[in-house]
A protein has these predicted regions:
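Secreted/luminal cysteine- and crosslink-motif detector
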Residues: 46, 82, 90, 150, ...
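Proline-rich low-complexity regions
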Residues: 13, 155-158, 173, 377, ...
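C-terminal beta-strand edge segments of enzyme domains
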Residues: 204-439
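Cys-nucleophile CN-hydrolase/nitrilase-fold catalytic domain and related Cys-dependent amidase chemistry
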Residues: 2-106, 176-199, 204-209, 325-326, ...
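Active-site catalytic loop in hydrolytic enzyme cores
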Residues: 49, 58, 62, 66-67, ...
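Cleavable C-terminal sorting propeptides in eukaryotic secreted/cell-surface proteins
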Residues: 436-462
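Residue-level recognition of conserved structural "scaffold" positions that shape functional pockets
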Residues: 26-28, 424, 456-459
Length: 462
């Protein structure tokens, strides 16, 4: 394992030690009572009792010490409670948490984080902390924060870790369901690094048959290394990341924003479903041009200037905008501008899952007037791949633009905006012009009995 000799930190996936498919009771034997490192200084590898009382923590601590690196692992934490003294205590007398643990290079436990936003059926197995935990840890190579999977879509704890606690790096165990066009793991996680100007180390479980795939090491200027595959084989990814990710290199373009004219949807626009949300689209009918679209005549608008190498007769592209409360498999308020390839030549296919594209864009600039500071830019290309050196974005994010002619066909480009303060708003109503037969796209959650650890990451010391 010579590749680990100069590594600073390694990150393993969510549920990488246990796999999925548990009930609350069947998960219990895999849990350990993890102490709070803020209250207790503990090195399990140097504790004579730990091997018998906490065998998982003991082995992890010794691995970190043996290989002289920081170790980030997702596991289960259990905390006994009594209903007579704790009104929130579950009926079975224990709290169970999806938990990240971090050990330093000497084996000392330095961080423990309980997942704030369990995903769907996971809520039947683990508890949600009563208040969000903002967990950071300091290293010789920067300040880190950590959260898990579905947490990335919400304000707490993710956003304050960057804005208030000033972390430069995020370590992110996940079991992310890879859903194009806007929720592909490599696209969304890379966009979070760009939008929040941090390094983002994402270790995803690799079970392609249930849509778990896509891991990477991302900086504010793009992916340093990533892996996405539908084969059964996982991959180790190793990359060097900057200690100070907010120091953008000279020459990075910053585009001045211009106001998009508000207007009605117009006859050329149409609605279509994208992962449960009714986007307003305009088709790209010519090989080059400029399009504007505003959501229902509001001030939430998108503009696209583009030029294709060739307008292919077998592929259709559309510019889309959405402003509303997303309620499919979670509730969160979105404001999005996106340029997407449609599945077919029918307008109703715009927003459905597409994995391949042949149309090459010479250039494009996507601009959004989204009314939020939280915008995450992403570009996906043919085969669900990234083009990190071929496009850039403004800071703050209002524009996304190509730096050169793209080398692959374009699947999607997006400015993914979040209005966190509106997440508890009323459920949206269906637009009257959309027929009830509009196609719906859903993620179906499957569980597997055993999951091997196959994605983990190292950031080499500079």
């Amino acid at each position: 394992m010579t590749f680990l000799q100069n590594a600073s930190i390694i990150v393993f996936p969510e549920y990488g030690l246990t796999g999925f498919g548990y009930t609350r009771d069947s998960f219990q034997p895999f849990l350990e009572d993890i102490p709070d490192p803020k209250k207790t200084s503990w090195n399990a590898c140097e504790d004579p009792q730990a091997n018998s009382s906490s065998p998982i923590l003991y082995r992890l601590s010794c691995l970190a010490k043996t290989y002289d690196m920081y170790l980030v692992v997702n596991m289960g934490d259990v905390k006994p409670c009594n209903k007579s003294t704790d009104e929130n205590c579950p009926s079975d007398g224990r709290y169970q948490y999806n938990t990240n643990v971090v050990f330093d290079d000497k084996g000392k436990l330095v961080a423990r984080y309980h997942k704030q936003h369990p995903f769907l059926n996971e809520m039947k197995v683990v508890n949600r902390p009563l208040t969000p935990e903002f967990i950071t840890f300091d290293t010789p190579f920067g300040k880190f924060g950590t959260f898990v999977c579905f947490d990335a879509l919400f304000h707490d704890p993710a956003i304050p870790l960057v804005t208030k606690h000033k972390v430069d790096h995020i370590v992110f165990p996940t079991a992310w369901f890879d859903v194009v066009p806007l929720f592909a793991a490599i696209g969304f996680h890379g966009s979070w690094a760009r939008g929040m100007q941090v390094n983002f180390l994402s270790a995803n479980s690799h079970v392609p048959e249930v849509l778990n795939t896509g891991s990477g090491l991302y900086s504010p200027t793009g992916a340093k290394k990533y892996y996405r595959s539908l084969s059964a084989n996982g991959s180790l990814s190793v990359a060097t990341l900057p200690k100070s990710p907010r120091d953008r290199p000279s020459g990075t373009p910053v585009v001045n924003a211009t106001k998009i004219q508000e207007g009605n949807a117009g006859q050329d626009s149409f609605y279509s479903d994208l992962f449960g949300d009714l986007f307003l689209f305009k088709e790209l009918k010519k090989p080059e041009g400029t399009l504007d679209v505003c959501y229902n005549g509001s001030s939430i608008c998108c503009s696209l200037t583009y030029e294709m190498v060739e307008k292919r007769s077998d592929e259709m592209y559309a510019l889309g905008v959405f402003d509303g409360l997303h309620i499919l498999e979670g509730q969160y308020y979105l404001r999005i501008c996106t340029l997407i390839k449609c599945l077919g030549l029918n307008r109703n296919s715009c927003g459905q899952r597409v994995y391949n594209a042949s149309t090459i864009f010479k250039s494009f600039t996507l601009h959004g007037s989204l009314g939020t500071q939280y915008i995450y830019p992403q570009v996906l290309a043919d085969g669900v791949s990234l083009l990190p050196g071929e496009w850039d974005h403004s800071v703050p994010v209002t524009h996304l633009q190509t730096k050169q002619q793209l080398t692959k066909g374009l699947l999607t480009a997006a400015l993914f905006g979040r209005m966190y303060e509106l997440d508890d708003g009323p459920r949206p109503t269906t637009h009257p012009s959309v027929e009830s037969s509009a196609p719906q796209i859903c993620i179906h959650v499957f569980f597997v009995g055993l999951l091997s650890v196959i994605a983990y990451f190292c950031v080499e010391k500079e």
